[in-house]
Protein backbone atom coordinates (compact mmCIF):
# COMPACT_ATOMS: atom_id res chain seq x y z
CA UNK A 1 0.00 0.00 0.00
CA UNK A 2 1.31 3.44 -0.94
CA UNK A 3 0.61 6.61 1.01
CA UNK A 4 0.79 10.01 -0.68
CA UNK A 5 0.90 13.44 0.97
CA UNK A 6 -1.93 15.91 0.35
CA UNK A 7 -1.85 17.60 -3.04
CA UNK A 8 -0.64 16.42 -6.42
CA UNK A 9 1.92 13.61 -6.61
CA UNK A 10 3.76 12.22 -9.62
CA UNK A 11 4.33 8.46 -9.83
CA UNK A 12 6.64 7.13 -12.56
CA UNK A 13 6.83 3.48 -13.60
CA UNK A 14 9.17 1.80 -16.05
CA UNK A 15 8.07 -1.59 -17.34
CA UNK A 16 9.72 -3.70 -20.06
CA UNK A 17 8.81 -7.19 -21.23
CA UNK A 18 8.95 -9.32 -24.37
CA UNK A 19 5.39 -10.51 -23.80
CA UNK A 20 2.10 -8.69 -24.17
CA UNK A 21 1.68 -6.72 -20.94
CA UNK A 22 -1.48 -5.50 -19.26
CA UNK A 23 -0.82 -2.76 -16.72
CA UNK A 24 -4.07 -1.08 -15.68
CA UNK A 25 -3.30 1.51 -13.02
CA UNK A 26 -5.90 2.65 -10.51
CA UNK A 27 -5.71 4.39 -7.15
CA UNK A 28 -8.12 2.78 -4.70
CA UNK A 29 -8.72 3.01 -1.00
CA UNK A 30 -8.82 -0.09 1.21
CA UNK A 31 -12.58 -0.58 0.86
CA UNK A 32 -12.44 -0.34 -2.93
CA UNK A 33 -9.58 -2.85 -3.01
CA UNK A 34 -11.56 -5.31 -0.87
CA UNK A 35 -14.62 -4.92 -3.11
CA UNK A 36 -12.56 -5.42 -6.29
CA UNK A 37 -10.96 -8.55 -4.85
CA UNK A 38 -14.35 -9.94 -3.84
CA UNK A 39 -15.80 -9.38 -7.31
CA UNK A 40 -12.74 -10.97 -8.91
CA UNK A 41 -12.88 -14.03 -6.65
CA UNK A 42 -16.59 -14.61 -7.20
CA UNK A 43 -16.36 -14.15 -10.98
CA UNK A 44 -13.40 -16.49 -11.40
CA UNK A 45 -15.00 -18.99 -9.03
CA UNK A 46 -18.17 -19.01 -11.14
CA UNK A 47 -16.14 -19.40 -14.36
CA UNK A 48 -14.01 -22.27 -13.09
CA UNK A 49 -16.94 -23.98 -11.37
CA UNK A 50 -19.04 -23.93 -14.54
CA UNK A 51 -16.22 -25.26 -16.70
CA UNK A 52 -15.24 -27.94 -14.17
CA UNK A 53 -18.86 -29.12 -14.05
CA UNK A 54 -18.86 -29.44 -17.85
CA UNK A 55 -15.57 -31.34 -17.70
CA UNK A 56 -16.94 -33.80 -15.14
CA UNK A 57 -20.16 -34.26 -17.14
CA UNK A 58 -18.34 -34.98 -20.39
CA UNK A 59 -15.87 -37.32 -18.72
CA UNK A 60 -18.79 -39.34 -17.33
CA UNK A 61 -20.33 -39.44 -20.82
CA UNK A 62 -17.02 -40.62 -22.23
CA UNK A 63 -16.76 -43.34 -19.58
CA UNK A 64 -20.21 -44.61 -20.51
CA UNK A 65 -20.36 -44.03 -24.27
CA UNK A 66 -16.69 -44.00 -25.29
CA UNK A 67 -17.29 -41.05 -27.60
CA UNK A 68 -13.93 -39.45 -28.42
CA UNK A 69 -15.58 -36.04 -28.83
CA UNK A 70 -16.49 -35.93 -25.14
CA UNK A 71 -12.92 -36.67 -24.08
CA UNK A 72 -11.46 -34.10 -26.49
CA UNK A 73 -13.92 -31.48 -25.27
CA UNK A 74 -12.96 -32.15 -21.63
CA UNK A 75 -9.27 -31.74 -22.49
CA UNK A 76 -10.05 -28.50 -24.33
CA UNK A 77 -11.89 -27.02 -21.35
CA UNK A 78 -9.20 -28.15 -18.90
CA UNK A 79 -6.55 -26.50 -21.07
CA UNK A 80 -8.49 -23.24 -21.11
CA UNK A 81 -8.73 -23.28 -17.30
CA UNK A 82 -4.95 -23.75 -17.02
CA UNK A 83 -4.37 -21.00 -19.59
CA UNK A 84 -6.67 -18.64 -17.69
CA UNK A 85 -4.87 -19.43 -14.44
CA UNK A 86 -1.55 -18.75 -16.16
CA UNK A 87 -2.25 -15.40 -17.80
CA UNK A 88 -4.09 -14.04 -14.75
CA UNK A 89 -1.09 -14.89 -12.57
CA UNK A 90 -2.87 -17.42 -10.37
CA UNK A 91 -0.85 -20.37 -11.69
CA UNK A 92 2.43 -18.55 -11.11
CA UNK A 93 1.45 -17.85 -7.52
CA UNK A 94 -0.13 -21.24 -6.71
CA UNK A 95 1.37 -23.92 -8.97
CA UNK A 96 4.94 -22.84 -9.80
CA UNK A 97 5.84 -19.87 -7.55
CA UNK A 98 9.60 -20.59 -7.64
CA UNK A 99 10.03 -21.36 -11.34
CA UNK A 100 10.87 -18.30 -13.41
CA UNK A 101 11.22 -20.49 -16.51
CA UNK A 102 7.62 -21.74 -16.25
CA UNK A 103 6.37 -18.23 -15.57
CA UNK A 104 8.00 -17.09 -18.81
CA UNK A 105 6.74 -19.91 -21.02
CA UNK A 106 3.66 -21.43 -19.38
CA UNK A 107 1.20 -19.03 -21.01
CA UNK A 108 2.73 -19.52 -24.46
CA UNK A 109 2.76 -23.31 -24.11
CA UNK A 110 -0.83 -23.37 -22.89
CA UNK A 111 -1.93 -21.10 -25.74
CA UNK A 112 -0.52 -23.64 -28.17
CA UNK A 113 -2.09 -26.48 -26.18
CA UNK A 114 -5.47 -24.74 -26.37
CA UNK A 115 -5.19 -24.47 -30.15
CA UNK A 116 -4.14 -28.13 -30.45
CA UNK A 117 -6.90 -29.52 -28.22
CA UNK A 118 -9.49 -27.26 -29.87
CA UNK A 119 -8.59 -28.43 -33.37
CA UNK A 120 -8.53 -32.05 -32.22
CA UNK A 121 -12.02 -31.66 -30.78
CA UNK A 122 -13.23 -30.02 -34.01
CA UNK A 123 -11.82 -32.84 -36.15
CA UNK A 124 -13.58 -35.54 -34.13
CA UNK A 125 -16.84 -33.71 -33.47
CA UNK A 126 -17.32 -32.58 -37.07
CA UNK A 127 -15.98 -35.90 -38.42
CA UNK A 128 -13.79 -34.05 -40.90
CA UNK A 129 -12.08 -37.27 -41.96
CA UNK A 130 -15.29 -38.43 -43.68
CA UNK A 131 -16.35 -35.31 -45.61
CA UNK A 132 -13.19 -33.14 -45.63
CA UNK A 133 -10.21 -35.55 -45.48
CA UNK A 134 -7.72 -33.05 -46.89
CA UNK A 135 -8.63 -30.44 -44.28
CA UNK A 136 -8.49 -33.10 -41.58
CA UNK A 137 -4.98 -34.13 -42.62
CA UNK A 138 -3.85 -30.50 -42.87
CA UNK A 139 -5.15 -29.68 -39.39
CA UNK A 140 -3.60 -32.78 -37.87
CA UNK A 141 -0.13 -32.35 -39.38
CA UNK A 142 -0.14 -28.56 -39.11
CA UNK A 143 -1.02 -28.55 -35.42
CA UNK A 144 1.68 -31.13 -34.67
CA UNK A 145 4.26 -29.07 -36.54
CA UNK A 146 3.32 -25.91 -34.64
CA UNK A 147 3.61 -27.73 -31.30
CA UNK A 148 7.05 -29.11 -32.19
CA UNK A 149 8.27 -25.67 -33.31
CA UNK A 150 7.12 -24.06 -30.07
CA UNK A 151 8.77 -26.78 -27.97
CA UNK A 152 11.99 -26.18 -29.92
CA UNK A 153 11.77 -22.44 -29.21
CA UNK A 154 11.20 -23.09 -25.50
CA UNK A 155 14.11 -25.54 -25.25
CA UNK A 156 16.39 -23.10 -27.08
CA UNK A 157 15.07 -20.20 -24.95
CA UNK A 158 14.02 -18.17 -28.00
CA UNK A 159 11.42 -16.24 -26.09
CA UNK A 160 10.55 -13.59 -28.67
CA UNK A 161 10.12 -16.17 -31.45
CA UNK A 162 8.03 -18.40 -29.16
CA UNK A 163 5.84 -15.41 -28.32
CA UNK A 164 5.15 -14.60 -31.98
CA UNK A 165 4.55 -18.27 -32.84
CA UNK A 166 2.07 -18.80 -30.00
CA UNK A 167 0.01 -15.69 -30.77
CA UNK A 168 0.01 -16.41 -34.51
CA UNK A 169 -1.09 -20.00 -33.85
CA UNK A 170 -4.01 -18.91 -31.66
CA UNK A 171 -5.16 -16.41 -34.28
CA UNK A 172 -4.95 -19.03 -37.04
CA UNK A 173 -6.65 -21.62 -34.82
CA UNK A 174 -9.65 -19.34 -34.30
CA UNK A 175 -10.06 -18.79 -38.03
CA UNK A 176 -9.66 -22.51 -38.76
CA UNK A 177 -12.34 -23.43 -36.21
CA UNK A 178 -14.81 -21.10 -37.93
CA UNK A 179 -13.80 -22.41 -41.37
CA UNK A 180 -14.23 -26.03 -40.26
CA UNK A 181 -17.66 -25.28 -38.83
CA UNK A 182 -18.76 -23.47 -41.98
CA UNK A 183 -17.51 -26.27 -44.24
CA UNK A 184 -19.28 -28.93 -42.17
CA UNK A 185 -22.49 -26.92 -42.23
CA UNK A 186 -22.17 -26.68 -46.02
CA UNK A 187 -21.93 -30.50 -46.12
CA UNK A 188 -25.21 -30.86 -44.25
CA UNK A 189 -23.92 -31.48 -40.72
CA UNK A 190 -26.77 -30.13 -38.59
CA UNK A 191 -24.71 -30.15 -35.36
CA UNK A 192 -22.25 -27.81 -37.10
CA UNK A 193 -24.74 -24.97 -36.54
CA UNK A 194 -24.12 -25.13 -32.81
CA UNK A 195 -20.39 -25.52 -33.38
CA UNK A 196 -20.20 -22.50 -35.69
CA UNK A 197 -22.20 -20.31 -33.31
CA UNK A 198 -19.99 -21.41 -30.42
CA UNK A 199 -16.74 -20.66 -32.21
CA UNK A 200 -18.03 -17.24 -33.30
CA UNK A 201 -18.81 -16.40 -29.66
CA UNK A 202 -15.33 -17.47 -28.61
CA UNK A 203 -13.75 -15.53 -31.46
CA UNK A 204 -15.70 -12.37 -30.63
CA UNK A 205 -14.73 -12.55 -26.96
CA UNK A 206 -11.08 -13.11 -27.81
CA UNK A 207 -11.10 -10.24 -30.32
CA UNK A 208 -12.59 -7.80 -27.80
CA UNK A 209 -9.99 -8.71 -25.18
CA UNK A 210 -7.14 -8.40 -27.71
CA UNK A 211 -8.38 -5.01 -28.91
CA UNK A 212 -8.64 -3.80 -25.32
CA UNK A 213 -5.10 -4.99 -24.53
CA UNK A 214 -3.77 -3.31 -27.67
CA UNK A 215 -5.51 -0.05 -26.74
CA UNK A 216 -7.79 0.02 -29.79
CA UNK A 217 -10.93 0.05 -27.61
CA UNK A 218 -11.26 1.30 -24.02
CA UNK A 219 -9.75 -1.03 -21.43
CA UNK A 220 -12.15 -1.90 -18.61
CA UNK A 221 -13.14 -5.04 -16.68
CA UNK A 222 -15.83 -5.90 -19.24
CA UNK A 223 -13.58 -5.70 -22.32
CA UNK A 224 -10.71 -7.44 -20.52
CA UNK A 225 -12.97 -10.30 -19.35
CA UNK A 226 -14.74 -10.56 -22.72
CA UNK A 227 -12.71 -13.68 -23.50
CA UNK A 228 -14.12 -15.31 -20.35
CA UNK A 229 -17.68 -14.42 -21.34
CA UNK A 230 -16.99 -15.69 -24.85
CA UNK A 231 -15.69 -19.03 -23.59
CA UNK A 232 -18.73 -19.39 -21.31
CA UNK A 233 -21.06 -18.96 -24.29
CA UNK A 234 -18.84 -21.17 -26.42
CA UNK A 235 -18.79 -23.92 -23.79
CA UNK A 236 -22.57 -23.77 -23.36
CA UNK A 237 -23.23 -23.99 -27.10
CA UNK A 238 -20.71 -26.79 -27.57
CA UNK A 239 -22.39 -28.71 -24.74
CA UNK A 240 -25.68 -28.32 -26.63
CA UNK A 241 -23.93 -29.48 -29.80
CA UNK A 242 -22.64 -32.61 -28.08
CA UNK A 243 -26.09 -33.32 -26.64
CA UNK A 244 -27.66 -32.90 -30.09
CA UNK A 245 -25.08 -35.20 -31.64
CA UNK A 246 -25.69 -37.84 -28.97
CA UNK A 247 -29.45 -37.62 -29.58
CA UNK A 248 -28.86 -38.09 -33.31
CA UNK A 249 -26.79 -41.21 -32.63
CA UNK A 250 -29.54 -42.62 -30.40
CA UNK A 251 -32.20 -41.98 -33.05
CA UNK A 252 -30.03 -43.60 -35.72
CA UNK A 253 -29.49 -46.65 -33.52
CA UNK A 254 -33.21 -47.02 -32.80
CA UNK A 255 -34.00 -46.68 -36.50
CA UNK A 256 -31.40 -49.31 -37.39
CA UNK A 257 -32.83 -51.69 -34.79
CA UNK A 258 -36.34 -51.11 -36.15
CA UNK A 259 -35.22 -51.78 -39.73
CA UNK A 260 -33.45 -54.93 -38.55
CA UNK A 261 -36.74 -56.30 -37.14
CA UNK A 262 -39.25 -55.16 -39.76
CA UNK A 263 -39.14 -54.87 -43.54
CA UNK A 264 -39.73 -51.19 -44.46
CA UNK A 265 -41.61 -52.07 -47.69
CA UNK A 266 -43.95 -54.86 -46.60
CA UNK A 267 -44.15 -54.11 -42.89
CA UNK A 268 -43.58 -57.80 -42.15
CA UNK A 269 -41.28 -59.01 -39.40
CA UNK A 270 -37.95 -60.26 -40.70
CA UNK A 271 -35.39 -62.79 -39.54
CA UNK A 272 -34.14 -60.87 -36.50
CA UNK A 273 -37.66 -60.39 -35.14
CA UNK A 274 -38.40 -64.08 -35.82
CA UNK A 275 -35.30 -65.16 -33.92
CA UNK A 276 -36.07 -62.86 -30.97
CA UNK A 277 -39.69 -63.99 -30.66
CA UNK A 278 -38.96 -67.61 -31.57
CA UNK A 279 -36.22 -67.82 -28.94
CA UNK A 280 -38.63 -66.65 -26.27
CA UNK A 281 -41.28 -69.19 -27.38
CA UNK A 282 -38.71 -71.97 -27.44
CA UNK A 283 -37.50 -71.14 -23.93
CA UNK A 284 -41.10 -71.08 -22.64
CA UNK A 285 -41.84 -74.47 -24.23
CA UNK A 286 -38.73 -76.00 -22.68
CA UNK A 287 -39.48 -74.53 -19.28
CA UNK A 288 -43.09 -75.78 -19.21
CA UNK A 289 -42.49 -79.02 -21.19
CA UNK A 290 -44.83 -78.02 -23.99
CA UNK A 291 -44.69 -79.04 -27.62
CA UNK A 292 -44.44 -76.40 -30.35
CA UNK A 293 -44.65 -76.63 -34.11
CA UNK A 294 -43.73 -74.34 -37.00
CA UNK A 295 -45.19 -74.16 -40.50
CA UNK A 296 -42.69 -73.32 -43.22
CA UNK A 297 -45.26 -72.89 -46.03
Named regions from a protein language model:
Residues 38-61, 168-181:
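First transmembrane helix
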Residues 256-276, 297:
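Conserved nucleotide-binding and Mg2+-coordinating catalytic segments in signaling enzymes
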Residues 277-297:
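Active-site-proximal structural segments of metal-dependent nucleotidyl cyclase/transferase enzymes
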Residues 66, 78, 122, 266:
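Conserved hydrophobic/aromatic pocket- or pore-lining residues that grip, position, or stack substrates
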Residues 56-75:
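Juxtamembrane interface at the cytosolic side of transmembrane helices
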Residues 72-76, 136-139:
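Cytoplasmic-side transmembrane-helix entry/capping segments in multi-pass membrane proteins
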Residues 1-41:
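Soluble non-transmembrane domains of integral membrane proteins
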Residues 82-124, 129-256:
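Interfacial "cap-and-anchor" motif at the non-cytosolic start of specific transmembrane alpha-helices
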Amino acid sequence: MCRFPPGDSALYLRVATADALILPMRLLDSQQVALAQQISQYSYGALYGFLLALIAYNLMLYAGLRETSNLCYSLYLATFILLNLSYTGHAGAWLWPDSLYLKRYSTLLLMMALAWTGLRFARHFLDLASHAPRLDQALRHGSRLAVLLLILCVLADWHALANHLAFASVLLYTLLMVAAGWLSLHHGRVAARYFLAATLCGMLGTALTDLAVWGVIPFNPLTYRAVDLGILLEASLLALALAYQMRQHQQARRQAESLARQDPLTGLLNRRAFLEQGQQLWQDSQRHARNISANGD
